[in-house]
Regions:
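Membrane-interfacial loop-to-helix junctions in multi-pass transporters
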Residues: 1-2, 85-92, 118-133, 161-169, ...
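Structural signature of hydrophobic alpha-helical transmembrane segments
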Residues: 1-4, 89-91, 143-147, 209-213, ...
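Membrane-helix interface "capping/anchor" motifs
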Residues: 13-24, 160-168
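Short helix-coil transition sites and intra-membrane helix breaks within transmembrane domains
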Residues: 17-22, 88-92, 102-112, 138-152, ...
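Core transmembrane alpha-helical segments of multi-pass membrane transporters/permeases
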Residues: 27, 52-112, 136, 285-344
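Long, contiguous bundles of hydrophobic transmembrane helices that form the permeation core
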Residues: 37, 41, 206-317
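Inter-helical loop and helix-membrane interface segments of multi-pass membrane transporters/permeases
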Residues: 38-79, 161, 191-203, 227-244, ...
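Hydrophobic transmembrane alpha-helices that form the pore/transport pathway of multi-pass ion
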Residues: 119-203, 207
Length: 344
């Protein structure tokens, strides 16, 4: 508990007070905790880890003994590096692909198309509910801050066009976006949780969607109540994203990058549960890295079509996506390193 308190104090102090980048704060905290961990705790961790691996059939007695002997010789800094590398291996490709999917959807107009379709389905009298669903769907492949900045101008335009409650729209966007971002992979938080506790990624998706539906329902009713109690006027924005639909792809191609990974990973999960003979392709395509990779290629194709094969734009969009994704990867991996040395 002392090392946990020390590590958390270092992270919070560096991030909140000294405004240090979260990556550096987490690595510094992980290093301090690693060097401060007593040998007794390391032996206990190695014993518990090897026992759990033997119970799962992943280790034999000889390999467990070899692991404990090798682990005792690992230096504190190398343990940090190993945990960091393990975190990258677990989530690196998935986050990179998710970043590319999100960027391609934004640049191609697919994200705006998704919003427009949902609004048309619900009707202008239930725009708040439409924003709730839009935020939830888009925040699965797209990071929450991007979803927020995408939807807010549309909410402003809808408030001016229909005279609707702007605060209701904003709260619905926040409720839908935050719940998907917190509960449904491939967003980094739930993805890392699934990897750390050994939960199948497909099961995490299904469970996150189920819990998310419940929580966003509560969020919607709170938004309805709060929007009647408080008032918020929409700002004037010249960017009306509802008026320009010429660049938008088809409805099917707009939804495909979001739906495809869920279907593929779910198929792989069902294959593992029911042992479907003759359908091994479901297991192959259900690999989370491959599923996100295929979806990223679909999203990239949608962008390619929307920009008529403009190579410079494709290159810039990809570079921007991987730049933003890389930051998330190293922060997530640093968090894995910090969590790993705390467990040790």
């Amino acid at each position: 508990f002392l090392l946990l308190g020390l590590g958390m104090a270092i992270v919070l102090s560096l991030v909140i007070w000294l405004k240090v980048h979260p990556f550096l704060a987490l690595i510094i905290a992980a290093t301090v905790v690693s060097f401060s961990t007593p040998e007794k705790s390391l032996k206990s961790y190695a014993e518990n880890y090897t026992q759990s691996q033997k119970d799962r059939g992943k280790m034999t007695d000889s390999s467990a003994k070899q692991f404990k002997d090798d682990f005792a010789k690992v230096s504190p800094m190398k343990r940090v590096v190993q945990e960091f590398g393990g975190g990258c291996a677990k989530v690196g490709l998935i986050i990179a692909f998710a970043a590319l999917i999100g960027k391609c959807m934004l640049e191609s107009g697919a994200a705006s198309k998704v919003v427009m379709v949902i609004i048309s389905l619900f009707g202008e009298k239930r725009v708040g509910l439409a924003f709730l669903c839009s935020g939830f769907i888009l925040a699965v492949p797209v990071f929450f801050d991007t979803v927020f900045y995408l939807l807010i101008p549309i909410a402003v335009a809808m408030a001016h066009r229909t005279g609707g409650n702007y605060l209701l729209y904003v709260l619905c966007i926040v409720a839908g976006g935050t719940m998907a971002h917190s509960l449904v992979p491939p967003t980094p938080g739930p993805l890392l949780v699934a990897e750390e506790i050994g939960v199948d990624i497909g099961a995490m998706m299904i469970g996150g969607l189920g819990i998310g539906i419940f929580t966003v329902t509560f969020g919607y009713f709170y938004a309805k109540w709060a929007s009647k109690k408080f008032k918020l006027s929409p700002p004037d924005l010249p960017d009306d994203r509802l008026s320009d639909e010429g660049y938008m792809p088809s409805t099917f191609m707009s939804f495909l990058p979001v739906i495809l990974p869920v279907l593929l990973v779910t198929g792989g999960t069902l294959h593992g549960i029911f042992k479907l003979e003759g359908f091994e392709i479901l297991k192959v395509l259900g690999d989370k890295n491959l599923a996100l990779g295929i979806s990223a290629m679909v999203a990239f194709f949608v962008l390619y079509r929307s920009c008529s094969g403009d190579k410079e734009r494709l290159k810039n969009s990809s570079s921007d996506a991987f730049s933003s994704g890389a930051v998330i990867v190293i922060i997530t991996a640093a968090g894995a390193a910090f969590g790993g040395v705390l467990k040790q």
